[in-house]
Amino acid sequence: MSKTLNWGILGAGAIAKTFAKGVARTTGGKVIAIGSRSQGKADLFGDELGIARRYGSYEALLADAEVEAVYIATPHPEHAEWAIKTAEAKKHLLCEKPIGMNFGEAMAIVEAARDNDVFLMEAFMYRCHPQTQKLVELVKQKAIGDVRLIQATFGFRMPFDPKQRIWANELGGGGILDVGCYPVSMVRLIAGAATGRDFADPISVCGAGHLHPITRADEYAIASLQFAGGIVATVATSVGLEQENVVRIYGTEGYIFVPNPWLPGSDGLDTKILIYSNGQPEPREIAVETPNWLYAIEADTVAAHIDLRQAPSPAMSWDDTLGNMKTLDQWRQAIGLTYDAEKPENVPTVHRKPLAVQARGPKNNMKHGSIAGVTPPVSRLVMGVDNETFSPVVAVLWDDFFEHGGNCFDTAFVYDSGRCEKALGDWVRARKIRSQVVILSKGGHTPECFPGPISRQHRESLDRLQTDYADLYMLHRDNPAVPVGEFVDVLNEHVKSGTMKAIGVSNWSLPRVQAFNDWAKKNGKTGLAAISHQLSLARMIAPPWSGCLSANDPEMLGWLAQTQTPLMPWSSQGRGFFLPSTSAENHADAELVRCWHREDNFRRLERARELAKKKKVLPINIALAFVLHRPFPTFALIGPRTIHEIRSSLRALDVELTEAEMRWLNLED
């Protein structure tokens, strides 16, 4: 990179002009190109701001080899597509806030920056200003004691126009995404500073708001956020209502008032923070010197940290951005705001290309195996569908898994009262890939583990999944009081009708599994194609849920090896036990402690860490590879919440373990 950072700008609107004027006041940057949807707009922009290279398309600007960094100033719904394309063009990027329409798009943008080794920052310019740095310092120094309550507001009134960006549904209109993202980012920053971190994500988000009756954009909205450490916050935003755009931070010894939090020193003027201490009649004024125009400071922040690929706090790091977008999603969901483009049938791929499995290679290292009765070869990693249901988020996750060769999805009748099944069915239907995926459906969970409810649940699951059949159907629990033949009969009825292609059981004891197969064989019925029990390198010492069983005992493992019955193990990575934060001293996660903390497991963890260093992977990759290298077919269930976690899991497929390494990891040496 040259000494002067050469900028290109995508989008020729008002914010693009403001940024270009800011760059002109920097010492290390220069705008050399403008890209617009039309040549005419690019020419007008270039004439006004003295920019020689004017492109009538965004693609043309990205093809300019001398453009090193790109400021994305397009409308919200276009951020993801062009941020990803910018990263793929190997150019650093500063993306206008919000970085995407939702957490799903934000994940994809961050992963594109990571994949292509480029700088990325979300353009909250106030986070780069010295005033924000001073505010963080005051909180850390306990200038008002312990922080208890934070209030932040950003709102304005714009006359309603359904075609205007502020109000249009198709352009992501409304207060939360336009300016509500500012107070959310501020209270998360302050809550983090008060608890010794760069930022904090809320434990809970409750919200209320008013949606415009025509476009359903949020006209005004508020939210209450609860953080660790006893900190609560309120945020408010609007595009149809004037508000007092300030920040107040209340502590045990006073409060801080920030009169101009969002545009501090925008034209280079100094700014101030006021501290009201308990018992003092007048506030203490903290003057903050502004070294340059606000947007110049932002551009210089990018240039100064290009080599790090992220800027340090209080600027927006990647994780900070992801946490902010997650919180904005929660706020919007609390007030019932889902944009038309986010409805299941409308969600596009984040890169705006047709969904397709990548060719075998670095972007697709998936391995597949066979399960009797299931037609497509089954991916050795199975996507757990048991948590997130917001359409634009699950679409990004599942698209990424599918593009990397993953085709098996595990869900159940009881997960989130059926919403998980519905979300999966919506995605498969919208993407038109039913014949290309394997759906593992489960029913018969306690207390309805009887033959009668199983048929009813199966029919309801098919309706939610919007399909005529389950590729593999499993009983979620066992009921030993029911003769095994009754379960064999009811499942075989559905096999005969074609609504179950193959059948299995989850969390059954070995004697009951054997009895099922024996009864089926004796009576000419279909037996078990696979089973699903817990299995991981770390031994489960207590089940996370009632009625769960592990396959990690000599008899079950021996039977699996002898019969070559496929195992689809859940909690295959020990539910986070192999993450860097795990230690015998860390009791923050009570469930992790209850289910996994034991001396022998910590020895396995240390060995996984040692072998991971040798093989240049992560300990969690070693743990998953251990499950995939068993002497019987395994199809490991994983539960990634982010694209990055998907990519991390995929690395395990390339890890080779010798028999000696397997024994050593399991303390059998």
State where each predicted segment sits:
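A contiguous active-site-proximal alpha/beta segment in oxidoreductase catalytic domains
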Residues: 100-160
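C-terminal helix-rich "cap/oligomerization" subdomain common to oxidoreductases
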Residues: 1, 69-71, 304-365
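N-terminal Rossmann-like dinucleotide-binding module
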Residues: 1-49
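N-terminal binding-site loop/beta-alpha segment at the start of enzyme catalytic domains
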Residues: 346-437, 496
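NAD(P)-dinucleotide binding in Rossmann-like oxidoreductases
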Residues: 213-218, 228-300, 306, 310-319
